[in-house]
Design a protein with these regions (language model features):
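Acidic catalytic/metal-coordinating carboxylates
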Residues: 36, 62-65
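Active-site beta3 strand of CheY-like receiver
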Residues: 47-53, 58
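Alpha4 helix (beta4-alpha4-beta5 surface) of REC/receiver domains from two-component response regulators
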Residues: 65, 86-101
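C-terminal output helix
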Residues: 89, 107-116
C-alpha cells in the first residue's frame, strides 16, 4: 500500500517556511506543521504520514534525538533532516541512524519538492519509465531477432534480454514480463537453429571467426591475470544464469571494478562436459584421448573428479611453467566454513586459487525433487531472488571480500546456465539411452517434434 501524500514538517520556525509549504501544496501534497517535538509525536500517533521533514534544532531536544521515537511509532516512515548545521559530525550522525535524506538550510522549495517526490512517488515514476523504455525497445529487439545475427550480435541480444528480465522481474509489470517471456521463447528457438548450423564450423576452424568457447576461458581470461599479478582467484559458480548475475553484479561491483566478457559453452552444456572444458582447455574427446582412465562407464558426478589436475596441466601448457593451483569445491555449509578459514592462506600465495560453488546448481535441479525448493524457487524471478539471498551471506562473497582486501584479481564465471521449461520435448529412445535432460546419447533416437531437438549424427564434428 503506498504511503499517503501527506507531509509532517517539524520546525520551530515553521512560519518562515510558508512559501515552501504553499509550493508543496500546489503540487498535490498536504502539509501539516508542528513547532515542537512533542506536538509532532502527538500528530504521528493519530495518523500516518508519507514523509517527515524534521529540523535538527528543536526547543527542548535535538531532532536527531526525536528520530528514535518517530521510528518506534512508524518504523517505515521516511525522515528527512532539515538543518542549519553544516558540521560533518551532524551529517555523520544522520547517516548513522539511517535518515532518508539530509538538507542544509537555506533550502529552496524545489529542493524540498524533489526529495519528497523521490521518497513518495519514486517507485511509481521508475515503474512508468521502465514500462515506456521496454515498450519502445521491444519492437527494436523483435526486428533485431528477425535479422541475420552473427555470434557477436547474439551475445548482445542475449545480454540485453537478461538485463530486461532482471529489471522487469523487480517491477510489478506482469504484462510486460509475459511479453518478454514470449519473446524469449522465440529467441531460444532461433538461437538453437543458429547453433545447429554454426557450432560444427567453429570446432572445424578454431582459428576462424568464432566466439570464445569454454575451452578458451583460461587462455583468454585467466592467464593474463597471472602474467600481470602473479596470482588470481578463479571462481566458477555452477549453473549461474546471466539474469542471476545481473542481481549479483551490484554486490560484486561494490568490491571490484568489473570488466565483463562473454563466451559460448561447448555442447553438451551439462556440467561434466562444460566445466571440464573450462579447467582443461580441451573438448570431451580430447580429454578422453589424453586421460582414457578418467572417462569410462561412470556416473556424471565422477566425470568432474579431476578438475584440479586438468587445470594444473592446462596452466602449465599456457604459461610454460608450473603454476601452483589450490582447488576447492563448495557444496555444503561445512565446506563453506572450512573455505573461510583457509582462503586467507590460499590468497597469500602465488598461483591460482580455484573455487567451484554448487549451490545454484543444487537449487535449480533440486526444485524437481523437493517441494519446498520448488515453492521458494518456482519461477525465474524467485530463482533470482533466492540466489541473491544466498550470495549475500555466502562463502563466495566472503572469499571475494578477502580477495579485495589482498588486492588479488578475480575471474568469476559460470560453466552453463539453465532454462525453466514449460513445454516438454518428447524423445523416443531405447532403455540404455542416457537419462540426462540436456542431451541424449543412444541408438535410434527420435524427437516427437523434430524442431525441439538438435540431432547429431557425427559426434566428432560436435
Amino acid at each position: 500500500m503506498p504511503r499517503p501524500k501527506t507531509i509532517l514538517w517539524v520546525d520551530d520556525e515553521i512560519e518562515s517556511l510558508s512559501a515552501h509549504v504553499l509550493f508543496l501544496e500546489e503540487h498535490g501534497y498536504r502539509v501539516e506543521q508542528a513547532a515542537h517535538g512533542d506536538d509532532a509525536i502527538a500528530l504521528l500517533q493519530r495518523q500516518p504520514y508519507g514523509v517527515i521533514l524534521l529540523d535538527e534544532q528543536l526547543p527542548g531536544r535535538r531532532g536527531l534525538e526525536l528520530v528514535a521515537e518517530v521510528r518506534s511509532i512508524d518504523p517505515a516512515v521516511p525522515v528527512v533532516m532539515v538543518t542549519k548545521s553544516e558540521e560533518s559530525g551532524t551529517m555523520h550522525e544522520a547517516i548513522g541512524i539511517q535518515l532518508n535524506d539530509y538538507l542544509v538550510k537555506p533550502v529552496n522549495p524545489r529542493q524540498v519538492l524533489t526529495v519528497v517526490t523521490r521518497l513518495l512517488e519514486g517507485d511509481q515514476i521508475r515503474q512508468q519509465r521502465l514500462a515506456r523504455d521496454f515498450v519502445g525497445r521491444f519492437r527494436e529487439l523483435e526486428q533485431q531477432r528477425r535479422s541475420q545475427l552473427g555470434w557477436r550480435e547474439w551475445v548482445d541480444l542475449t545480454v540485453e534480454v537478461a538485463q530486461w528480465e532482471a529489471r522487469l522481474g523487480e517491477s510489478e509489470e506482469q504484462g510486460l514480463q509475459e511479453a518478454l517471456h514470449g519473446f524469449q521463447v522465440s529467441v531460444h528457438d532461433d538461437f538453437a537453429r543458429f547453433i545447429e548450423s554454426h557450432y560444427p564450423r567453429w570446432l572445424a576452424n578454431p582459428r576462424g571467426d568464432r566466439p570464445p568457447l569454454s575451452v578458451d576461458v583460461c587462455g583468454e581470461f585467466l592467464t593474463p591475470l597471472l602474467e600481470t599479478h602473479g596470482k588470481a582467484l578463479f571462481v566458477v559458480v555452477d549453473c549461474l544464469r546471466l539474469d542471476q548475475w545481473e542481481l549479483l553484479k551490484p554486490h560484486v561491483g561494490s568490491l571490484f571494478d568489473i570488466e565483463e566478457s562473454y563466451y559460448y559453452s561447448i555442447l553438451p552444456s551439462a556440467t561434466p562436459f562444460a566445466r571440464n572444458a573450462i579447467f582443461s582447455g580441451l573438448l570431451p574427446l580430447e580429454i578422453k584421448a589424453k586421460h582414457p582412465e578418467w572417462w569410462g562407464d561412470r556416473d556424471d558426478e565422477s566425470l568432474n573428479a579431476h578438475e584440479e589436475e586438468l587445470l594444473t596441466e592446462q596452466l602449465h601448457e599456457l604459461v610454460g611453467d608450473a603454476v601452483p593451483v589450490r582447488y576447492e569445491k563448495v557444496a555444503t555449509l561445512a565446506e563453506g566454513e572450512a573455505l573461510q578459514r583457509r582462503i586467507p592462506g590460499h590468497l597469500s600465495q602465488p598461483g591460482v586459487t580455484a573455487l567451484v560453488f554448487n549451490f545454484v546448481d543444487q537449487l535449480t535441479h533440486g526444485r524437481a525433487e523437493n517441494a519446498i525448493l520448488f515453492e521458494v524457487a518456482r519461477n525465474s524471478g524467485a530463482l533470482r531472488s533466492v540466489t541473491r539471498t544466498w550470495f549475500e551471506d555466502s562463502a563466495l562473497l566472503r572469499a571475494l571480500k578477502e580477495a579485495e582486501r589482498r588486492r588479488v584479481p578475480v575471474l568469476l564465471t559460470t560453466d552453463h546456465g539453465s532454462i525453466h521449461c514449460h513445454t516438454p520435448a518428447t524423445v523416443y529412445a531405447k532403455r540404455d539411452t542416457t537419462a540426462n535432460l540436456r542431451y541424449k546419447f543412444g541408438e535410434d533416437l527420435r524427437a516427437q517434434k523434430p524442431s525441439t531437438a538438435v540431432r547429431v549424427e557425427d559426434l566428432r564434428a560436435w
